[in-house]
Amino acid sequence: MIYPKTYDVIVVGGGHAGTEAALAAARMGAQTLLLSHNIETLGQMSCNPSIGGIGKGHLVRELDALGGAMALATDKSGIQFRRLNASKGAAVRATRAQADRILYKAAIREMLENQENLDLFQQAVEDVTLDGERISGVITAMGVEFKARAVVLTAGTFLSGKIHIGLENYEGGRAGDPAAKSLGGRLRELKLPQGRLKTGTPPRIDGRTIDFSQLTEQPGDTPVPVMSVRGNADMHPRQVSCWITHTNTQTHDIIRSGFDRSPMFTGKIEGVGPRYCPSIEDKINRFADKDSHQIFLEPEGLTTHEYYPNGISTSLPFDIQIALVRSMKGLENAHILRPGYAIEYDYFDPRNLKASLETKTIAGLFFAGQINGTTGYEEAAAQGLLAGANAVQYVRGQDPLLLRREQAYLGVLVDDLITKGVNEPYRMFTSRAEYRLQLREDNADMRLTEDGYKIGLVSEAQWRMFNEKREAVEREIQRLKTTWYTPQKLAEGEQIRVFGQKLSREANLHDLLRRPNLDYAALMTLEGAMPSENLSAEVIEQVEIQVKYQGYIDRQNEEIDSRRDIETLKLPDGIDYGKVKGLSAEVQQKLNQHKPETVGQASRISGVTPAAVALLMVHLKRGFKDAK
């Protein structure tokens, strides 16, 4: 049957990408349908019970700046919060939280069920329908056809998923859930370029069988950090600690004894795994000289005894898993509640996507999350929001939301995917960005909220909060510039106490704050330095960073401006680069294969040289008339 209601946007999949995509589209006013094989697992944390971290936390803040759900759900479910790299530069400081799985899923479910313009339906999707070269809808397992003008696919690890434990394997999307075999086959029929990747998860441990007296405690931070600009510490549930143990030489010998039954080393697994989250057997094989690896025991929630041993993801046989777990200090009597496993799944080459995350071959079809070759909740959620928003923009015939590399880590992520592709699961690091100083956690709202508000992603309440913060920052910076001190105005002892030396000349608070040995709090102890208004910690942090890093930021802005013409210069559709004189055969082949949308994208394709970019610029100035 054909369902009687036609939707603007259909989202397939209810993981982190799918829920953000559906919420984004509905917030923008589009009639949206979210389809999942099981609505009880919407927003489920399939692997580790944590959100954020270096690079990933930056993505979460960017999501939040665009009205996304992940940061707020984390504030409602986080049972431990830590500020990473707090003593380092502002660019690499990041927030990480342990989340209660049940509370996190409940927070996401509550947002979904209370979001206007959003319908939920429980049914697996087995087919997509086309009208020529445009998407027109989907068909579910029981034959219901849902019509829509745009479809966002967020299938995670479910497309032709295969689970491995030792030499045993079976079809599955994750433990306890079926694979999306029919949909995977249908997408392959559409000639979309695809491959296989792999990820894994560790065995889960019953906390009642852990001897915590032998472990090192790792508490959260005090005061407790907050993830969302819409959140606060009062939202947080009870806070708990993580615990640290280590592998040892006995552990490593046990792991090596299972190599002959490991699907990784016997060729059973063909997919490539994540480089920066390797299995324990991969770590022992690659780093044979190391006698020990740190393992974090992370609580899964407040109402369960289950612990997640971060660092021993494995697909070794279950008997080896038991032995390796029990070889570690504090885990000698540990009971495993669930075995670790690896999962192989289909992904589709993201070089077949536009910067909007729409496929180049099927109009109105968008991909987000692990289907694009990424790994991680945060990477998936960020793509989901962007794909959901751009599906609405596509339906309305409006320009997509495109984020530049110097504007957002989400811009870096998408640009890396669509220009370079992936040969292993992609995860975000701050080192992937050229302009890290611009892309800090603390200024995500300053970078993105206005763009989100313009297209309807950001609520009026969040927009009002943002403007209040932005105006407070501007007022305080101006006040610092107009508050002056002379050597005569301050007692000599006061000068030495605050500045570490005597003032040699008149200076304002703005210039004094730029000194590396001074911070805002110390300056405010000067007589007459305190502002008349009460400033939030977020405003003070923003003021201090803007003032202290102003010189570096200005230099980066100059560099960005010098490249802006290259970055945004559009390449005409349908160009045959083989007819562009001066380009080598290799460059012609790669440009024709990748079909970049801008000169900036072309410049980041492997093998495209600066000389080739210069030739493209020359031809663009001439109009490309002869090259078409």
From Swiss-Prot:
Keywords: Cytoplasm, FAD, Flavoprotein, NAD, tRNA processing. The keyword NAD applies. Gene3D superfamilies: FAD/NAD(P)-binding domain, GidA associated domain, C-terminal subdomain, tRNA uridine 5-carboxymethylaminomethyl modification enzyme MnmG/GidA. NAD-binding protein involved in the addition of a carboxymethylaminomethyl (cmnm) group at the wobble position (U34) of certain tRNAs, forming tRNA-cmnm(5)s(2)U34. It is found in: Cytoplasm. This is tRNA uridine 5-carboxymethylaminomethyl modification enzyme MnmG. It comes from Neisseria meningitidis serogroup B (strain ATCC BAA-335 / MC58). Pfam families: GIDA (PF01134), GIDA_C_1st (PF21680), SAM_GIDA_C (PF13932). One of its GO terms (cellular component) is cytosol. FAD binds at residues 13-18. The gene is mnmG. HAMAP family: MnmG_GidA. Its main location: cytoplasm. One of its GO terms (biological process) is tRNA wobble uridine modification. Signal peptide: none annotated. Belongs to the MnmG family. NCBIfam families: mnmG_gidA (TIGR00136). GO terms for molecular function: flavin adenine dinucleotide binding. Homodimer. Heterotetramer of two MnmE and two MnmG subunits. NAD(+) binds at residues 273-287.
